[in-house]
């Protein structure tokens, strides 16, 4: 009996320690409120708009009672509505747009649950998302101001945001196609090729876009292996357009940078490979809202604790911005075999290049 009493006393002692260690002060009637967390990035060359809406907690009391609610981060289906509206924009200085009171179009977004990942890394449950399919009408409405609304069952607006699309350069008709001229150099019309005739310098020059604030060029390097064309994307550093009157922007993707990407990607290759005499140049662009959000995210990932996350969501948090990711040009690659130029330098990497050019 002494042993039993000793054991019981031991368990009571441990239990009391756990109670003290896990003690949480909270009031079941504490004031707390749902704050919508909204993420949407428009791309005028995409036919579908996707919006992620979750909810987060803001209040002065404990999160304990909030965390016990099942699926507390998602709004149940039917509890909110998400709308996208396009308002006619009035042009201002530097291609800025201000919304007028003329509604061009509107869309009620559809609720959809994306399947979750049941196990392994990044396991999660199903993810609710909202979408609409304006089609290529977005392409025609780059002079509009877009408004995003999150509305509850009582028809109250929980969150609201506006943004404008990154615009287009002058569109021209060539045959039956609409052509936009963004890339300036290399100029394929003048027979220019992308390469490193000036050692270590591969310049990309482009026309700035209306409401384009942040740009990132990417070089798509191609090579041939067993008759198939493979690609290695080589990202350049991004450029922020701080001068609204600037009409041209440029950035270099150096030979050194290209070689380092290729060497890392092909370090385990044991086959003979060939250079393809064509490269792709992709230019991504985003507007001021998305640039400010990305910039604040970069600050948050650093060592400093003195930062604020940018949000343009009224009544909530998150981002409603725009980007363009389909600006692509294919240009010839400089096929000079001289010492110090691309072909000879690729061969020196010892990752399988024959030194010959594929087609």
What are these regions (language model features)?
Residues 22-359:
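A sequence/structural signal for flexible, mid-protein segments enriched
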Residues 2-11:
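Bacterial N-terminal signal peptides that target proteins for export
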